[in-house]
């Protein structure tokens, strides 16, 4: 049986932690940040843990847990 292919779009956006959770970047940080206050920008810095409902679908796109 051939190797399964990784969906590269998902591999660029998600990482799987050692415990199996999904990490992803927070949206809304590219441009037009003057309309947001400093608290919003500070809290959305870094990464976030993904929703449990989306885990199965995204893990299917990442068969080797990139």
Swiss-Prot record:
Q: Name one Pfam family in it.
A: Ribosomal_L35p
Q: Where are the transmembrane segments?
A: none
GO terms, molecular function: structural constituent of ribosome
What is an annotated GO biological process for this record, any one? translation
Q: Does the keyword Ribosomal protein apply?
A: yes
Q: Which GO terms describe its cellular component?
A: cytosolic large ribosomal subunit
Q: Which domain of life is it from?
A: Bacteria
- Keyword check for Ribonucleoprotein, yes or no: yes
Keywords linked to the UniProt accession: Ribonucleoprotein, Ribosomal protein
UniProt xrefs under HAMAP family: Ribosomal_bL35 (MF_00514)
Q: Which family does it belong to?
A: Belongs to the bacterial ribosomal protein bL35 family.
Q: Which PANTHER family match?
A: 54S RIBOSOMAL PROTEIN BL35M (PTHR33343), LARGE RIBOSOMAL SUBUNIT PROTEIN BL35M (PTHR33343:SF1)
Q: Report what the protein is called.
A: Large ribosomal subunit protein bL35
Q: Which organism is it from?
A: Hyphomonas neptunium (strain ATCC 15444)
């Amino acid at each position: 049986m051939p190797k399964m292919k990784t969906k590269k779009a998902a591999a660029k956006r998600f990482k799987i932690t050692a415990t199996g959770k999904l990490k992803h970047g927070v949206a809304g940080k590219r441009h037009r940040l003057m309309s947001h206050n400093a608290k919003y920008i500070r809290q959305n810095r870094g990464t976030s843990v993904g929703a449990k409902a989306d885990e199965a679908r995204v893990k299917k796109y990442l068969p080797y847990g990139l």
